[in-house]
From Swiss-Prot:
Span(s) of short sequence motif 'HIGH' region: 14-24
UniProt name for this protein: Methionine--tRNA ligase
Enzyme class: ligase
Localization per record: Cytoplasm
Co-factor(s): Zn(2+)
Length: 702
């Protein structure tokens, strides 16, 4: 990596159509804040930019359901989420809005520049039009039957039952959500961004980061690149959003697609931050200086938007320029998912713990620490109330809080609240803690985004400090050797300071309270200054003889009793019971036998044994596999919605049951010549039916 003088950290914009939950916090906002606070603690020049994503169809649907305007919807959730972030200690330097005029101006500027260069393509396509409502229908406004699993309530963008990504025109029996009428296909023109034009440049960009990006990010991005990048629409027929800024009849009633608009918020919000800081050109130092570094914190469901699409937009802007060139992200630390009590967070089923509601009951730092210790870096993790209780009580209260309080109380009671001894560097280094190595480990962990390790290292120091104080027994030693007890307490107080510094990025409010108990004026945030590294202070004792601490200690963490989490556990029981009822109802529906058919009707279905010769994922359809089958002497291609449960490699060589005389159809631009049989288990997993036997390929199943 090149020499870096400043760092710009961005976080994926939460959608202003609902409250953020703990899964969002764990995946994006907390790790970003911990990283930013560490960079500040090192004295580095870093800014933290975030904001609300306030455009898109789900917002207009919510507004129509509630009989209010889209602006009312985003105002509500922007306020709610920004306040929840503030209470949680997420320290944005600027938290913007994509509905702001400043953002609209930036997005239009990018559109016009890329349009001026002739990069966009205009394409006429057939989209559904609701004649009753007199408007084109975006994907979420169309519902119908899924062509893969026959779910009658599939949406125009995805079937929630089988997970297949769809387009509205693939639905069977489509209906408009606006009028319940059957929509008709009409021609409409849209602007497209040619991602394929930048394929080679994007491949080189990803290759340059294959050793410093997380493997999941590199692998997922390369899967898309391997499939080949296609043109992607950047406009849609909608009234809510950023209007296409052209004096052109074809631009009327069209807005920028949210995938193009939202990522530009990182730039527009940085511009707005600079303007409010009194220097309208300051943003350029973070976006356009080659010695600046951009880091995008995201969840794994946002990877390609930040490793392919956003970089391609910036490449399009930079093309042919000698100045005003934007930096591409230096790292895109995408997390896995944090689940809740063994299941995925689900807003639609209200199976979630919302951040604002959580903070009404429990302190922010207990949550920050619990999530940091369970950060989903390389695999999905799980938030449970029991684990939260155990970490708060056993680690924060009994280990960290207990040590701090004992140290402050004993100093106040036996040494009049004054540091009683001047510790030397040699004294500091015989504690059993290698401070140079600790600083090196912390720095490596932060720079590699190992959030769990950073929190764990801090708690390891707390355990060592607690052990040192307990084994030294100053309450006994003081009776015979006051100086030895004084030395113990001076070292303990310096350990309190070291813990405040070490754990500041993870539990900043608690670090500030420790800092205040140690007798320092002002806040610990004010102590963290650009150009001065607080982390280097760990190398030597910082509290010297005669320094006065605060006379009163405080309990840093109140233990969480069973009664405190009992309402939450009961709430989970109800949510799980409701989910089980839905699953039981679905199972009951599945167990209802279909109407009786005649034997002649049964004979019409031609079931054959087929062998899978090849398998691959279908482009931009995460749940579909394209199977190449051998059926006797014939070759067939079949699409199957099983990619979530079987890898292509697992399918090759399997014998499957093929519905051989099913009418051919086109799905996602691919021909499917039949259907293979699978069974859905109670857990939702699809299991392919595999006939067993030798030399049965092509044989009819009777």
């Amino acid at each position: 990596m090149q020499h870096v003088t400043r760092t710009l950290v961005t976080t994926a914009l939460p959608y202003a159509n609902g409250p953020v939950h703990l899964g969002h916090l764990a995946g994006v906002y907390l790790p970003a804040d911990i990283y930013v606070r560490y960079k500040r603690m090192k004295g580095e020049d870093v800014i933290h930019i975030g904001g609300s994503d306030e455009h898109g169809v789900p917002i207009t649907i919510t507004a129509e359901k509630e009989g209010i305007s889209p602006q009312d919807v985003v105002d509500r959730y922007h306020r709610m989420n920004s306040e929840a972030f503030r209470k949680c200690g997420i320290s944005f330097d600027y938290y913007g809005r994509t509905s702001s005029q400043g953002h609209h101006d930036t997005a239009k500027e990018f559109f016009l520049e890329i349009e001026r260069k002739g990069i966009f393509r205009r394409k006429t396509e057939k989209l559904f039009f609701d004649a009753k409502a007199e408007r084109f229908l975006s994907d979420r406004y169309v519902t119908g039957t899924c062509p893969i699993c026959n779910n009658p309530e599939a949406n125009g963008d995805q079937c929630e039952q089988c997970g297949t990504h769809l387009s509205p025109t693939e639905l069977l029996n489509p209906k408009s959500k606006l009028s319940d009428a059957t929509p008709e296909l009409r021609d409409t023109m849209h602007w497209y961004f040619p991602l394929g034009r930048f394929q080679e440049a994007l491949e080189a960009y990803v290759a340059s980061h294959e050793h410093d990006w997380r493997p999941n990010v590199v692998n997922y991005t390369r899967t898309w690149l391997k499939q080949g990048l296609n043109d992607r629409a950047i406009t849609r027929d909608l009234s809510w959003g950023i209007q296409v800024p052209l004096d052109d009849p074809e631009a009327c009633g069209k807005v920028l697609y949210v995938w193009f608009d939202a990522v530009l918020g990182y730039i527009s919000f940085t511009r707005q931050w600079a303007a409010e800081a009194g220097d309208e050109s300051l943003w350029r130092a973070y976006w356009q200086d080659p010695e600046s570094r951009v880091v995008n914190f995201i969840g794994k469901d946002n990877v390609v938007f930040h490793t392919l699409m956003f970089p391609a937009i910036l490449m399009a802007w930079n093309e042919g320029r000698q100045s005003g060139i934007y930096n591409l992200a230096d790292n895109v630390p995408a997390s896995e998912f944090m689940n809740f009590e063994g299941r995925k967070f689900s807003k639609s089923r209200n199976y979630a713990v919302y951040l604002g509601e959580f903070l009404e009951k429990f302190p922010a730092d207990t949550l920050r620490y619990s999530i940091a210790m369970n950060y989903p870096e390389n695999k999905d993790t799980d938030f449970s109330w029991q684990d939260f209780q155990n970490r708060t009580n056993g680690e924060l209260a009994d280990t960290l809080g207990n040590f701090i309080k004992r140290s402050v109380d004993f100093t106040n009671s036996r040494f009049d609240g004054v540091v009683p001894f001047s510790c030397t560097d040699d004294d500091w280094n015989v504690l059993g803690i290698d401070w140079s190595q600790t600083i090196e480990k912390l720095d490596q962990a932060y720079e590699q985004f190992h959030i769990r390790e950073t929190a764990s290292l801090g708690m390891d120091i707390a355990r060592s400090a607690n052990r040192f104080l307990t084994e030294s027994e100053p309450w006994k030693v003081i009776k015979t050797d006051r100086e030895a007890a004084a030395k113990t307490m001076a070292l303990s107080l310096n350990l309190c300071y070291a813990l405040a510094i070490t754990l500041y990025p993870v539990i900043p409010e608690t670090a500030g309270r420790i800092y205040a108990m140690l007798g320092f004026e002002g806040s610990i945030d004010a102590r963290i200054k650009r150009g001065v590294s607080a982390i280097e202070e760990l190398l030597a004792p910082q509290l010297h003889k005669g320094h006065r601490i605060r006379k009163e200690s405080e309990i840093l963490f109140t233990k969480i009793e069973d009664a405190d989490i009992e309402p939450e556990l009961k709430k989970i029981e109800k949510l799980l019971a409701d989910a089980e009822k839905l699953e039981a109802a679905a199972l009951s529906q599945e167990m209802t036998f279909k109407p009786e058919i005649s034997f002649d009707d049964f004979l019409k279905v031609d079931l054959r044994v087929a062998t899978v010769l090849g398998a691959e994922k279908v482009k931009k359809a995460g749940k579909l596999l394209k199977l190449q089958l051998k059926v006797g002497t014939e070759a067939r291609q079949v699409l199957a919605g099983i990619a979530q449960f079987y890898s292509p490699e697992e399918m090759v060589g399997k014998q499957v049951v093929l519905v051989a005389n099913l009418a051919e159809r086109t799905i996602r631009g691919e021909i499917s010549q039949g259907m293979i049989l699978a069974v859905e288990g109670a857990d939702g997993r699809l299991c392919v039916v595999e006939p067993v036997g030798d030399e049965i390929n092509g044989q009819q199943i009777q």
